[in-house]
Regions:
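Conserved active-site neighborhood of the chymotrypsin/trypsin-like protease fold
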Residues: 42-54, 105-169, 207-208, 289-295
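Catalytic histidine site
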Residues: 12-83, 131-133, 160, 227
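C-terminal subregion of chymotrypsin/trypsin-like serine protease catalytic domains
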Residues: 44, 228, 232-295
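Conserved hydrophobic positions within beta-strands
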Residues: 37, 112-116, 198, 226
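Conserved catalytic-core segment of clan PA serine endopeptidases
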Residues: 2-8, 27, 61-137, 146-148
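Mixed-charge, low-complexity intrinsically disordered segments
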Residues: 55-96, 169-183, 243-255
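Flexible, gly/ser-rich surface segments that form the specificity/activation loops bordering the active-site cleft
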Residues: 142-209, 217-221, 237-251
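Catalytic nucleophile loop of clan PA
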Residues: 36-37, 216-237
Length: 295
């Protein structure tokens, strides 16, 4: 049903690969998010929470570099550990503090000086503009649904994103105490589509802003497009709602491997939530970003 649509949408949907590290963690944490392009001028949209992570990475990294610079000034003597403890208090570092975030835009543009971001004041929506690139590495751009009255309960739609990161082209440099991207390893993760039926609509202050689907949006699909069987874009995945079903099972005895075990289960229904196409188009118009529509 969505074969041709996925092929079409994949031409302008791209992953953002991220590698994170906590102060007390010994392993690097890979993650992915999704953006998709709306024109041939380097404009893309994604979730505001994704954009905030991208924007916040620089400050997080600068803060840790300042910490390292001060730490290097300590003499390696009996007072070293005590001095480092004081420095940790100064920078408010604890084992769970995020100290490094490295991001990599995959197959978007050749090079760039940076990006400009416009975040929606209330919705989980943001515009990203790639700056000073020479060549685009995406082949097409989104076509948004022109008449949103066609979106009705029971309509089957699809989302595309990168929820299961498999890239491993990064390493930890113990000498510099830093995360580094490498030329070795896997630089891409497979795209992952997931379908769902339109169940309800989301509104606030009598203003429609979202579409609810019968299946969850997965971690890493945030910022990815919601589209129909033609590849026409209806919205953008931004979160998943968890509804308690009330079918609770407490200490029920069942047979497991020829033995009796007690189990408990609390069931939830996981529903995807997407920003409505009309809200996206209104935000693009507000910032005078060119986009395209189709029936």
């Amino acid at each position: 049903m969505f074969i041709s649509a996925i092929e079409r949408v994949s031409k302008f949907t791209r992953p953002v690969n991220s590698v994170m590290r906590t102060y007390g963690g010994k392993q690097l944490i890979p993650g992915s998010s999704t953006i998709f392009f709306v024109n041939d001028r380097g404009y893309a949209i994604t979730c505001k929470h994704v954009a905030e992570l991208l924007l916040g990475a620089e400050n997080i990294n600068i803060n840790f570099n300042n910490f390292k610079r001060e730490r290097q000034q300590f003499a390696n003597d009996g007072k070293f550990k005590t001095n480092v403890k004081g420095l940790e208090l100064k920078y408010k570092f604890n084992p769970d503090t995020l100290i490094q975030v490295k991001n990599n835009f995959i197959d978007c543009v050749d090079t760039m000086s940076g990006f400009t971001c416009h975040a929606h004041p209330t919705l989980d929506l943001a515009i990203i503009k790639f700056n000073d690139y020479k060549t685009l590495h995406y082949q097409d751009c989104a076509r948004f649904l022109k008449d949103s009255s066609k979106i009705k309960q029971g309509k089957f739609l699809c989302r595309l994103g990168f929820p299961f990161p498999e890239f491993n082209n990064f390493t930890f440099n113990t000498t510099t105490d830093d995360i580094e991207w490498t030329r070795e390893g896997i630089s891409h993760s497979p795209q992952f589509p997931i379908e769902g039926m339109v169940t309800r609509f989301l509104a606030e202050n009598n203003q429609l802003y979202g579409i609810e689907l019968s299946t969850p949006g997965l971690r890493g699909q945030s910022g990815g497009p919601l589209f129909d069987e033609k590849g026409t874009v209806y919205g953008m995945q931004f979160s998943t709602k968890h509804l308690h079903l009330g079918f609770d099972i407490v200490d029920k005895e069942i047979m497991v491997n020829n033995g009796v075990k007690k189990i408990s289960d609390y069931s939830f229904l996981h529903l995807g939530q997407c920003i409505h196409v009309d809200a996206i188009k209104a935000f693009l118009k507000q910032h005078e970003v060119e986009f395209y529509e189709e029936d």
